[in-house]
């Protein structure tokens, strides 16, 4: 198939210098091209401080002098068409720095990279994939996800499941093989979205994908770019959305990467007080430079347009917003007003979210922001950052700390579990139980829980009940939906054999039932960030460590009452205030034997009585099971 001619025009250079060339990835990088009837590859790279740039690779036996690039204009872009180069060719840019160094750099815009520990870029063609997800894409752009169910399965492909027979030490499934397994699992469990960790190319497995060298390349650990397209396509066909972890906060310092790319700091800030993360040993992007902002904004659009991704979860937003994040005195510089806010990063978020909101309203931007920064999900015109959702890290912290307590002491910290509702309407929240909570000696979710094994799993079930009843979208890291007992490690697969154990199978079945209810009843998602969608029945029964509340929908039909007991005690004839005199039907009892419980029963139907209790005119009474 003959390719059109690729070239970099003066208009391309101008827009890139302005920071508004959102198709720049179609010009910079390596692109199959035809010039004067001759097929080959057009190479383009931004290296404004280089004395010279040459292309080296398998096509010229890595000859360092044979293919010098031409500098195009004053913007620092270099270009060269090389006849005869084909897809699959490995290459690098040889940068001659002004201080005399020779730098062997991978292509920042490459779409495919050599399998690690190799560091070369690979010529590839990402056009021409036969997408079959048009129905999904059309429906996506019409949805208001604030009013839709969102239950996210956070997943690391390399450790989800290991391949027993692929002949490698890592045992990675490729994207296509993984698709066959993950699609079936997510459909069975009723998750709405999957959030994939570590997709952008990165050299070190132990970074989990958070120290990136190839922002425009799906990692070759699991196959080719079109293999990754296949994965997204299959997920969409199954009705599952795809969110990627995206890391604009910092990047890896590996020699072949972006750091000191042309001998000087062009992607990072040259002052280490602004350009380095001492805590992480990484470089910080220079958000005040137009070309850098362009690189990042175009990258988000690249995943959206070329790979049909449905959203990005922006990692470490707090580290971008605060100039002194993770730094000691003397390691940071204040802004022009003398404060610690990173004004350039704030403007970058405005730029990113305004471009996305204005063109692709169905595409989600999700902030992992761990402080109380205001208006993260407010519109940019309302002095907000413009994100679609924010992880509720405060809820996560309070939830985990409370659930770790021995039930005897929970009454003393009762309001930790109610506090998040006091600020729930301030942002569009996602409730995350993510990978960060099951590593570094924090224990898996089930092993955070107190007591003997049966108590631990009962705690987990009632904890998940609280999570799914609480306002906010949901996120569970892989393995936590069946009670993975070991902490997560990127080096090994989940302990799937545990599904043969009664307690693990019980939790797995229970989470499946919660997800089914969550998707069925609009009361559980339609008014998440609105006080009209939530009403406490009794938030104050610290003595019994119980909570009761009602979730509501706009129609007023099928509102749901939650009653939760956070102790191992069975509270007999327990009274719960209710809003109306009506018959209340049991939907789910976490103490059923099929969930691994002790089998304490709750009546299938209970009629409310005219017995005022806790500010309500009506109430119901029943035996409330332990951890039920």
For each feature predicted by the language model, list its residue ranges.
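Conserved alpha/beta catalytic core and glycan-binding cleft of carbohydrate-active enzymes
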Residues: 308-310, 328-490, 498, 519-576, ...
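Carbohydrate-interacting/catalytic domains
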Residues: 1-149, 176-186, 190, 454-457, ...
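Short catalytic/ligand-binding loop motif for oxyanion handling, primarily in non-cytosolic enzymes
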Residues: 101-103, 161-163, 202-205, 250-254, ...
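Short glycine-biased active-site loop of nucleotidyltransferases that positions the nucleotide triphosphate
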Residues: 70, 204-209, 253-260, 377-378, ...
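Short, flexible loop/turn elements at secondary-structure junctions
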Residues: 47-49, 73, 84, 156-161, ...
